């Protein structure tokens, strides 16, 4: 091992805290060891170095005096001040603070100490790198070139060795300087991050101060009043300080960071030596804010847990909803196939009724209607079926129309096709009993209320599935009632429209009758006025005038009255015709109403019959489905049994084949001849 590796190493800057690694001290051990080596051997400095290279302090002074940066020279005391201050701070910290503060070091204090030590080391290394080459060149010039004599070689040997060692040390110091510059850049970056964090902390402190000012402006809370009453009863005067948590480990991390801030520590001694009532009030409010923050954190964690629970429930409900939607789709398809089968059965029933009772009570029109309905269903079948080839329509082709028997056979094929489609649909099983939800949410709500320290208020409304189903059923009932009312209103509207049409038809007839009555009244009024004027002898002038009017009137209106009489006869004929037409319309309206009632009654009976038929068909379909499933299950079991038998037979055949093969090989292979046998 080299002498440099065996020398003791010293630490600079500060003493490391227990359980903490000091990267600055570890990386600067070699430089400190070399500096210590030069300090322990002053005779080497004075013997082999020049007068300007006797100590590192002289190197620093010469570097500052001769350097090209024009930097003011610093005394050794000024250069060592950051390190001494760091040592004093670190030596005073364990005395003032307990083990809890040592276990949680201050980030800013550590950064300041490391930065000051790094600046001092970098300055020393720069001055060393500037002074070492000059001192070595001066020493070489003073000593001169080595002579051929042995005494000069012996005198110059130690100097050359020392110069080589110094050159090697200079190269090593340059490498260490590069490493330290990298470390300094990293430290500056971390310092910038720390400054940014410090700014954020200052903003948070400003926000806290604003909130504290708002709290001061607001009325005091009951907890603060109780704390003040307790503090007034227990202390007096300047000792009225509210209770704060003494354990530093239980304090909030934000408060610890505020306490460890270098900007706040610079005023720590003054605040502890001369406390003020505002400081106590601030600490009281900070304690309350800390409690509120912890309470809000607990509440936030609880809300997150409740949210996770609700999220899981929502996911499970979404899965169940997707399953129910698939089941509803399957049921819808099955219902559609059942309705199609119902229509086909109705058409088949109509065809059979028309075919059996052609001479009893049915007409040819019913048979034609049934055939048209069957043709429509067959066209629908051709449109919906994808695999089968479409059949040509009977209307556009020259082929004769199919007979009812052919239509019935085709409809039976359509029914078979619908049954096959219906069998492919997976019908869900019957729903089991609805399980009651777990009582986890009320417990969570009670915990939330306990954390918030509020009185238990009204519980949140819980909508269970049964209640939702009841509300949905009630809504459906109301909707059905509204639909029924709408239908009744529409029927009343149709009746009113029919009455309005009848009244509109009667309007011209009534107008003609009104005109005839007015004309007759005017005519009778004219006759009466003429008779009265002839009988009145009161005045001769009036009698003469009346006579003139009486005689001139008929003479003047004779031709017009004949036309009016002729017109009145036409009007009376038209009026009688309109009255007869109105009577006919009323009779037709009455007959139409009766027919409508009959049609509605028939529709109701048909609906009832179709409902019964659909129920029977559903039962038949369910029975067929069960039978089909049973047959399919039996067929599967038989197939499995046959496959097992085939496998066993194959295994037996393989074994027999192997035995036969071995026997054949044994028989075909010639054995060794016996003593009494020959090959012949």
UniProtKB/Swiss-Prot annotation:
MF terms in GO: PDZ domain binding
InterPro entries recorded: USBP1-like, USHBP1_PDZ-bd
Comp. bias intervals (Basic residues): 1-15
Annotated signal sequence range: none
Region (Disordered): 1-51, 134-161, 220-247, 384-405, 524-549
Record keywords: Coiled coil
Stretches of the chain forming a coiled coil according to its record: 179-218, 363-386, 467-506, 573-662
PANTHER family reported in the protein's UniProt record: COLORECTAL MUTANT CANCER PROTEIN MCC PROTEIN -RELATED, HARMONIN-BINDING PROTEIN USHBP1
Stated family: Belongs to the MCC family.
Subunit structure: Interacts via its C-terminus with the first PDZ domain of USH1C.
Designated name of the protein: Harmonin-binding protein USHBP1
UniProt source species: Mus musculus (Mouse)
Phylogenetic placement of the source organism: Eukaryota, Metazoa, Chordata, Craniata, Vertebrata
Designated gene of the protein: Ushbp1
